[in-house]
Amino acid sequence: MSLSKIIEFPFEHYLKKHTSPTGEVDFSELIDEFKKMGKMLMPKLGVAPKMPMEKMMEQMAKAKITELDYRAKISKEPIEKAFGEKSSSHNSSNVKVVPPPFVPYAIDILSNVKRTTKSAIYINVPFCQTRCSFCMFYISPYKKEESKRYTDALIKEMRMWEKSKSVGTSPVHAVYMGGGTPTALEAEDLHRIIKTCHELFPLANDCEFTVEGRLSYFTDDKIESCLEAGANRFSLGVQSFDTEVRRRMGRLSSKEDLIRGLEHLCSYDAAAVIIDLIFGLPGQNDENWGEDLKIVSSLPIDGVDLYQLIMLEGSPLEKLVKAGKMPEAPTKEQRARMYKRGFEFLLDNHFRDLSVSHFGKTFRERNLYNVLAKSDADTLAFGPGAGGKIQGISFMNVRSYEKWLEKIDEGKKSALMMFVPEKNWRLYKKLGEQVELGFINWEYFEKTFNINLKDSLKEVISQWQQAGLLLDKGKFADLTL
């Protein structure tokens, strides 16, 4: 017997009862009810009380950031010594986990909650022509016949949300097609996806529409299909221009291929062109990192992102390094110096620091999606493994491509996991957003949240100032390099 036949939960009554005048929904009571019902129903359904996925999510939810984690080591080189090794590309916080059997019901509720903030859409394309050794986002190898199959399913998934309150009429400020490698898709399918977004969703007049990809296989017909359909930003994962470093990582194009390809893409003069560089790759050194930066400054691109390599445990790259088949990666201190050099070089060459990782060369680059992703912004998410958030309630779609296809074929939303944040989540998100931008506006928090954050954090502020991480500028605090 299916859960839908057993559970009769008064969703409409709940929504009316627990929706505030501003349209925000309190999910805490609903989650508690789900947990009570779960304990009662799981034995009848033959479901183990502790499923592997649920256990994993519980461990994630219990991860706490203690005050000690924020205390910096005082030294003459704060950028190198202030903190320990970074172990994750995402922050964690205290959350309530929606038990997996009840996620389908919770996502139906969430899809009918109005967006109340600036908003984004994230589309995950699960394919790559090759797997890069440093990447943990790889899902599936690309096969030409999968392009139409995936696109048909994606459009069907987007149409499931089309008339929900979460789509509504509030403007969407940024759309990001990531992955994976979106540019692996066929030209006509790239066109269909972008065009469908413009047709189904209330995109703002100045909506930033990004297509992420690689220059390999990003042919003229694909470029022109994206532009014609309404994309206005391309984000290309260069990672390094050094051919030897690239080949070790599983990248196909040589330095010369990349330079020619970027110059050609920029010659269209119809969209912002941004590239990613990674610092800390095995085999990188002062010489080839400096050469990468010089090439960036010479190209007619609109911006560049500098990302630190996080060598995650169990990644193909970590295994290769451990086996001695790959050079050792630069140390934490070496990576810190590489970042500092990159930051200073870009500013000296008149790039604008849009955030701690993103730099604009022209005013075409706005970096909207990346800032929204760190903020309290609502995000609709489509595709296998895509993650979204509405009013602080975050969700992630099933990661397996085949299982995602099955869900969509059955006419069901594909969410697999959901998390309900703690009470002050919006304050924490706004603080995280400002730190990402390189400053903290104390006055903003006083006006918006009625809290003297500067006083509440005075011990941490004092400690960070001693460590050389923070400059007190009255109503602002600026982060140092």
Can you describe what each PLM-predicted range is?
Residues 1-36, 40-119, 168:
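Flexible, acidic/Gly-rich N-terminal and inter-domain linker regions that tether
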Residues 111, 118, 140-164, 170-451:
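C-terminal scaffold of the Radical SAM
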Residues 442-444, 455-457, 472:
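Extended hydrophobic-aromatic, low-complexity segments
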Residues 475-481:
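Accessory beta->alpha helical hairpin/"wing" motif in late/C-terminal subdomains of nucleic-acid enzymes
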Residues 124-137:
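Local cysteine-cluster metal-coordination motifs and their immediate loop/turn environment
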Residues 451-463:
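Short amphipathic alpha-helical interaction segments
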Residues 465-475:
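A short, conserved structural fragment
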Residues 121-123, 236, 479:
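Short beta-strand motif preference
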